[in-house]
């Protein structure tokens, strides 16, 4: 990436976003969707946190934890996909607090009536709305973006309709260029949209590593 292109990318991305809330990740939480967008597992690999803007947010995730079975055996428990919505307007840090999940009985109770808490930096509970994401697709591989969009359009307990309208397929992204000074080729428009989104999700250290890598790339 050329230095000039990198500077343009940063000029587009950084001034319009203020990172004010840190979402601390948990190794027992598999984050699937953030604010209507699929979360890349490669992006989160090794990351301890995600930086968020102040305001309403929605997470779709699964709880994954090793539980004990009779006879000193163990198995990996994976919860149904859950939806949680909350507001970080006056919050600088968000932490997961999961209930005790050590055996089959506790896992069954969690499946039937999931409960967990989000805590701020002072370990105070954050108001949340929690629900199970009912999967409507019969496909072998679930598209959680689409399932989340359907959920947000259905006026459920943890629905946030604004994230349903923000969902966009490639054709929508290609036509949404109002924030750009000039209209680049379509493929570049889509690339910029995706790069900006991933850059916003990354924690400061990941962003720093990305910029170091980008500056070392030969001109295209």
UniProtKB/Swiss-Prot annotation:
Signal peptide (UniProt feature, chain positions): 1-20
Domain of life according to the entry: Bacteria
Pfam families referenced in this protein's UniProt entry, alphabetically: DUF2057 (PF09829)
Transmembrane segments: none
Keywords in alphabetical order: Signal
Coiled coil: none
Xref: InterPro entries: UPF0319
Family per record: Belongs to the UPF0319 family.
Matching HAMAP family: UPF0319
Descriptive protein name: UPF0319 protein YccT
Organism: Salmonella paratyphi A (strain AKU_12601)
Name of the gene: yccT
């Amino acid at each position: 990436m050329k230095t000039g292109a990198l500077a343009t990318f940063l000029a587009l991305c950084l001034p319009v976003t203020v990172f004010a809330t840190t979402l601390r990740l948990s190794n027992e939480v598999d984050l699937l969707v953030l604010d209507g967008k699929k979360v890349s597992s490669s992006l989160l690999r090794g990351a301890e946190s995600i930086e968020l803007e102040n305001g309403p947010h929605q997470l779709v995730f699964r709880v994954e934890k090793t539980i004990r079975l009779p006879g000193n055996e163990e198995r990996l428990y994976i919860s149904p996909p859950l939806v949680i919505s909350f507001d970080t307007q006056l919050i600088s840090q968000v932490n997961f607090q999961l209930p005790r999940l050590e055996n089959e009985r506790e896992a069954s109770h969690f499946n039937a009536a999931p409960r967990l808490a989000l805590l701020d930096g002072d370990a105070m509970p954050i108001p949340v709305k929690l629900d199970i994401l009912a999967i409507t697709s019969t496909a072998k591989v679930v598209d959680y973006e689409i399932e989340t969009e359907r959920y947000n359009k259905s006026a459920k307990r943890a629905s946030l309709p604004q994230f349903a309208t923000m969902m966009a397929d490639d054709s929508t992204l290609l036509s949404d260029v109002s924030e750009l000074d000039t209209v680049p080729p379509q493929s570049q428009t889509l690339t910029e949209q995706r790069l900006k989104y991933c850059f916003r999700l990354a924690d400061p250290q990941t962003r720093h590593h990305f910029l170091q890598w980008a500056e070392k790339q030969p001109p295209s």
